[in-house]
A protein has these predicted regions:
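Cyclophilin-like peptidyl-prolyl cis-trans isomerases
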Residues: 1-167
Length: 167
């Protein structure tokens, strides 16, 4: 279980899936190192998704490496559908370009199935996702009021391993 504690004290709890094991390992590894602490949800589109995990806060940064895309177009059978509450990895047009940026689906987006590595779902705190999705944004979908992830933590029973990196 991963808990995202927002700056306002509200929480989002995410249960990770075994359907994208390297993607989940990557996320847990970054969480265990405090990578996401203090980062923002830099791209928010109500009725679609909220995206965070960029160290620059712009959507252009990452951890300095990428992982293989664990989804059908990347040659991996991943049965998780991009339904409301699912967490998935953001990437560029390169299927193997995911690093640290992730998104939480705000409303069903099944057109993403097979193209992005879904690796878990929100089990508590969808009202917090809804609140983030409702904030005012600029023309680049950036919240006018920063939506800060104060601390992102793993439950004690989560095993952490380093992910397999491709670049």
């Amino acid at each position: 279980m991963v808990t995202i504690e927002m700056e306002n004290g509200k929480r989002i709890e995410i249960e990770l899936s075994g359907s994208a094991p390297n993607t989940a390992a990557n996320f847990k590894s970054l969480v265990s190192k405090g990578y996401y602490d203090g980062l923002i949800f830099h791209r928010v589109i109500s009725g679609f998704m909220i995206q965070g995990g960029c160290p620059r806060g712009t959507g252009t940064g990452g951890p300095g490496y990428s992982i293989k895309g664990e989804f059908k177009a990347g040659g991996v059978d991943n049965p998780i559908s991009h339904e409301r509450g699912v967490i998935s990895m953001a990437r560029s047009s390169d299927p193997d370009s995911a690093g640290s940026q992730f998104f939480i689906v705000h409303a069903d987006a099944k057109f993403l199935d097979g193209q992005y590595a879904a690796f878990g779902r929100v089990v508590s705190g969808m009202e917090t996702v809804d609140e983030i999705a409702a904030v005012n944004t600029d023309s680049s979908d950036r919240p006018k009021t920063p939506q800060v992830m104060k601390k992102v933590t793993l439950s004690e029973d989560e095993e952490v391993t380093e992910p397999e990196k491709v670049k």
